[in-house]
Amino acid sequence: MTTDTHTLHIEEILELLPHRYPFLLVDRVLDFEEGRFLRAVKNVSVNEPFFQGHFPGKPIFPGVLILEAMAQATGILAFKSVGKLEPGELYYFAGIDEARFKRPVVPGDQMIMEVTFEKTRRGLTRFKGVASVDGKVVCEATMMCARSREA
């Protein structure tokens, strides 16, 4: 457990998110402010299983997984802001608008994801997400997420 309340290491992330290898896409939280924003990192390794087929000889991190990594970051922000999931609750990726991919992400890149809380309405929370590598935007999107009891 860290002593700095604005960073989270993998052990703390595993306590918050239900995701596990190979689908856990957040390695560390660099900074956050409850109810406002969170900045996290995904270290992109050539050992990721999807690189075998995406694409042979020219590995590119799938854009849909960039979006998933940002969605996982919203989950961490939500759980740090309003509490962890209770038994029987799920946190859903409910929608996406204005997704744009600006440049490819490749093995060896360190992808920084910043998600910002925008608003909650009718059980949906809207976040703005931006992913970057070396200070250059690789993806941006508006994401909607919902927290609810299992059906």
UniProtKB/Swiss-Prot annotation:
E.C. code: 4.2.1.59
Keyword Cytoplasm set for record: yes
Any GO BP annotation: fatty acid biosynthetic process
The reaction(s) this protein catalyses: a (3R)-hydroxyacyl-[ACP] = a (2E)-enoyl-[ACP] + H2O
Molecular function as annotated in GO: (3R)-hydroxyacyl-[acyl-carrier-protein] dehydratase activity
This protein's UniProt keywords: Cytoplasm, Lipid A biosynthesis, Lipid biosynthesis, Lipid metabolism, Lyase
Enzyme class: lyase
Keyword Lipid biosynthesis belongs to the record: yes
Gene3D superfamilies in the record: Hotdog Thioesterase
Pfam families referenced in this protein's UniProt entry, alphabetically: FabA
UniProt-annotated location(s): Cytoplasm
Primary localization: cytoplasm
Gene Ontology CC entries for this record: cytoplasm; membrane
Residues at the catalytic site: H54
Functional note: Involved in unsaturated fatty acids biosynthesis. Catalyzes the dehydration of short chain beta-hydroxyacyl-ACPs and long chain saturated and unsaturated beta-hydroxyacyl-ACPs.
UniProt record similarity statement: Belongs to the thioester dehydratase family. FabZ subfamily.
Protein name (database record): 3-hydroxyacyl-[acyl-carrier-protein] dehydratase FabZ
Name of the encoding gene: fabZ
